[in-house]
């Protein structure tokens, strides 16, 4: 899947660990107040973007350019910076902009490092919650919370019958489509919160997260962390996620395959 050795992982992990701290400082010093909000859809719906989204992305891009000037960058707000490199950084400056706009705590900064278009390292940073998640190689994932580091793993005792599930279908599935997956709605459902839901599977607090219409910047940063924590992630057809797609995250293949079967009528 990748050609990174231990030294490579260490270089990128050190960069992302520092970047997480810098992003949190930037939020509290300059971006938490007096931001402006606009609507990307302009009368066709509501997809908010703020001046803080753009400032975060510019900051992240500048840090990447300073350290890895030959790498490609894809960001939600400023598009694709192409380069002659197999490495691409994928950025969602604020995942959960609606939460950000109303002063909620569950929005995050998302960054992945992709090699040959597949994510190999990820950072999910929650400035307000004062924690961030990261994989420091392909077999170990961690949460840094209140300056303390803790290794995370999925719930290894999870079973399908007692799986704790979160699903975000609003705005994506019609009522007719939802009627085709009744079992999903009869499972142990919990609130959903964008990338936080994926991280809650990675650290064993949830046993399944289902989302619709994720862009690569919405999901790629979480994928290496989930897999390094022992989890399983795919689209609803059990394929790698390489473009905008529906997402399923679980702690093991047994639960994964059973939920995929439940989703099959609409996948």
What are these regions (language model features)?
Residues 1-94:
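N-terminal subdomain of lithium-sensitive/metallo-dependent phosphomonoesterases centered on the IMPase/IPPase/PAP
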Residues 54, 77, 93-96, 127, ...:
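Generic detector of well-ordered alpha-helical packing
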Residues 83-142:
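DPxDG-like acidic metal-binding loop motif
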Residues 139-149, 254-258:
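Short helix-loop capping/hinge motifs at secondary-structure junctions, enriched
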């Amino acid at each position: 899947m990748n050609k990174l050795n231990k030294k490579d992982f260490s270089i990128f992990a050190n960069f992302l660990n520092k970047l997480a701290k810098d992003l949190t400082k930037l939020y509290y010093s300059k971006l938490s107040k007096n931001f402006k909000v606009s609507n990307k859809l302009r009368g066709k719906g509501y997809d908010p973007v703020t001046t803080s989204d753009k400032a975060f992305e510019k900051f992240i891009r500048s840090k990447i350019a300073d350290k890895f000037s030959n790498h490609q960058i894809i960001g939600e707000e400023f598009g694709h910076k192409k380069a002659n490199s197999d490495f691409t950084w994928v950025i969602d400056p604020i995942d959960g902009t609606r939460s950000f706009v109303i002063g909620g705590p569950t929005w995050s900064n998302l960054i992945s490092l992709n090699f040959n278009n597949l994510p190999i390292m990820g950072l999910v940073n929650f400035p307000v919650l004062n924690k961030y998640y990261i994989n420091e190689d392909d077999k170990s994932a961690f949460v840094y919370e209140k300056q303390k580091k803790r290794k995370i793993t999925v719930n290894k005792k999870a079973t399908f019958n007692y799986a704790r599930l979160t699903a975000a279908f609003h705005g994506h599935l019609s009522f007719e489509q939802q009627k085709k997956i009744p079992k999903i709605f009869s499972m142990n459902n919990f609130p959903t919160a964008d990338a936080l839901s994926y991280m809650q599977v990675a650290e064993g607090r949830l046993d399944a997260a289902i989302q619709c219409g994720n862009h690569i910047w919405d999901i790629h940063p979480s994928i290496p962390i989930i897999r390094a924590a022992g989890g399983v992630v795919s689209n609803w057809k059990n394929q790698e996620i390489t473009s905008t797609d529906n997402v399923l995250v679980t702690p093991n293949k047994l639960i994964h395959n059973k939920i995929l079967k439940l989703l099959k009528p609409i996948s």
